[in-house]
Design a protein with these regions (language model features):
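One-carbon transfer enzymes
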Residues: 8-11, 60, 155
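Short beta-strands and strand-loop turn motifs
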Residues: 16-19, 46-48, 107, 134-138
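Conserved alpha/beta core of the MobA/IspD/sugar-nucleotide pyrophosphorylase nucleotidyltransferase superfamily
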Residues: 90-163
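Conserved core of the sugar-phosphate nucleotidyltransferase
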Residues: 26-113
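Short, high-confidence coil segments that cap the C-terminus of an alpha-helix
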Residues: 11-13, 40-44, 131
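Short phosphate-binding loop-to-helix
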Residues: 1-21, 25-36
């Protein structure tokens, strides 16, 4: 869908941001930090992670990323999964993706990979086709709407904040 909009707009962009629809609230530093990942020319796709809460370890609705972070809290993704055996170098993956336009164009033309189908995780298609996904750790986890209860919480937040 993001690529379809990009084609319709018919404009040149340095980067294309895909913010997942289940993240209705986020802080601007999420996009600022993720965009800055592209100062490294080897990055194909940028995304973000945050600390994994104990309650999320066994939650299959929470996508996890394995990454070794450097002193700038950045690193290239090693894997994405819904279930984990150990929590070393495992973080909560946040559903924001920033693409170089040529990478997005190539990505949408690729067939689903075996691991993408098995895990129901689109980013595995990129990993399996050797795209470099760089992650940055942010200090907050934007609320995600995955269940009816989540939706109720977000609606209450909007109501309290006059949205």
């Amino acid at each position: 869908r993001v690529y379809e909009v990009y084609k319709i707009l018919n404009k040149d962009f340095d980067l294309i941001i895909n913010l997942q629809g289940d993240l209705p609230i986020f802080k601007k530093d999420l996009l600022e930090k993720t965009t800055k990942l592209f100062s490294d020319d080897s990055v194909d796709i940028g995304s973000a992670v945050c600390d994994l809460e104990d309650s999320e370890i066994n939650d299959n609705n929470v996508v996890k990323a394995r990454v070794v972070l450097d002193d700038q809290d950045e690193g290239f993704a090693l894997d994405f999964m819904r279930t984990v055996d150990c929590t070393k170098n495992i973080y909560h993956h946040i559903g924001v993706y920033i693409y170089k336009p040529n990478v997005l164009k190539e990505f949408v033309s690729l067939l689903q990979s075996k691991r993408e189908k098995e895990r129901n995780l689109e980013q595995m298609r990129a990993m399996d086709n050797h795209y470099k996904i760089k992650l940055v750790k942010v200090g907050h986890n934007p609320p995600s709407v995955d269940t009816i209860e989540d939706l109720k919480k977000i609606r209450l937040h909007f109501k309290k904040n006059n949205f």
